[in-house]
């Protein structure tokens, strides 16, 4: 049985499927923030895995190989998983004091 079979209720909040547009894609807010951070020049990410910020760090980790690697395969952004939020904040402060553009 298909999911649509037997359903008669018309939702006023239904979303119609759109045709796929060439050159566009749909992302969530954390993925957009990840891409914005990469294009904004972040070169140090320290993070502690906790909802809702984990997907932001995972987005950066996903996009770095495609967008921020040198010709010899070296990344231009360090990603460090900290043991807690305080350690992550300390790493970002250290990156800033050293002239880097860090985020947590």
Describe the function of each predicted region.
Residues 1-104:
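Thiamine diphosphate
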